[in-house]
Amino acid sequence: MNIGPFLFFIQLLWSIPHLPIFKSTNASRFKVRSLPDSPALPTSWAGRLPVPGRKDGNEIFFWLFEAENKAYDDTFIIWFNGGPGCSSLVGLMGGNGPISFDGNSTLLEHNPYSWTQLGHVLYVDQPVGTGFSTASNPYPVTTNEMITADFVAWLNGFFTYFPHLQSKRIHLMGESYAGIYIPYFTAALVESNTSHPLDIRSMSLGDGSWGNAAAMSSVAMGAYMRSQATALKLPSDILSAFNAADQSCGFDDVLAQAQIYPPKGKINIPGNPENFNYRRRRRDMTDVLNASCSISPKTVADVNESIFNSTCYGPCATYSTAMDYVDTASAGGTGIPCFDVYDIHHDCSTIDTLTLMAEYFSRADVQAALHVSGRGTYGACNSTILGTLLGAPSAVPPAYSILPNLVTERSISLHIYNGEWDMLLNHIGTELSIQNMTWRGAQGFSTKPQQLFYVDDAMPMNSSDMTGPGGRNATTKVAGNWAEERGVSYHLFRGAGHSVFANKPREMFAYVRDVVVGARNGW
């Protein structure tokens, strides 16, 4: 697919950051001295920087941590949460940063599996208006092109304060909607920053929305429900209704093709059967798109009516119908109590990190420590941004058409991972999307991702190797299954949901160490 117009757009905007907007490049004003109710922090800097080319009031918040281990001084990780419109502090506080909440309190404790032990780590609240970032009114960012241009321009300004990071080995990592952000950001950075090329080594997409929308939603939903029928408490007649829908809609044939290794050819994905990418839900939010469409299906007849005859969802709406059915069963007492689409094993006792974040980061003393005084009430996710960007036309070209070029022509490694308990963006849709992608002269993986990886060894040379970097031995627990070919890796984590590090911080630490930062040469 031709991405020339997109890159030309970025190249035009790349000149904007060179305007004399940044009056001072003294980073000391961003130094974080301490944080209330927190153990000692690694050296860090936080605050807001304006987006060059935007009018006053559009500023992006960052929190930068210095590498704790000098052996990883050459590594620079940039972390993005998704949403769109969710703060990167969700990742920082949720399992990959140096601090986390102590149980269900807002007291902070040290995280022994912080990625700051593996490199310099930058958390960015983008697009403007996300988390501690600010935005003008009316909301100025309405397209993916704008998001990309803003971030690229902002990052160039960021490097004027922290120029030593510009020469590091850069790894862009994120989850969920960051599966769309990261391919565009990477393409723009490698195409536009020609005078001072960045050494971008890899992209990591966790439970990301990077693939074909139908493939990652309706096509894969029935198969996921079958694989998790017991956990989802699905009656046999309801499961049969979804099985029949898969056959009627041709989804079973699509998935059968994806189970052939290597693929026999391009897999035809039905054209977006639900008339939009997929329903997006967030904790403590009502549905942003098509909220009135839910018919609360309880019976087989209700399910069939929603799948085949909904005037809201469109034809073959297995994804939205599944979400509605499981939600309805949960509310009615026959399903999973307090059902969470992000992790089907969550229940009513699960700690709500977003609520704790809202309480802690709304404190005036915390905001003063992070140099964002006067922000007022903090929200981890911004529903205005979510509605604005998900209601906009899909990004063109799609993210999955950009990734192969970055891997093939730019030699940038691509690491994809999923948690098995994520229903929002389930692993079956991810695996289908990988098998339908062509890079470095071949389509998909040639063998099924069934090699084992382990708690402290995310990239064993072979499944019988018992001397991995984490000191693995015969009693070490299996963490999941994986594969890698031609510069692309895929890991499926057992016992994890949408945010893998929230369930499996130790395993994700090994993943970043072994796969992202320490990947073998020749990828």
Q: For the regions a protein language model found, what residue spans apply to each?
A:
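Terminal and linker regions of secretory-pathway proteins
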Residues: 2-523
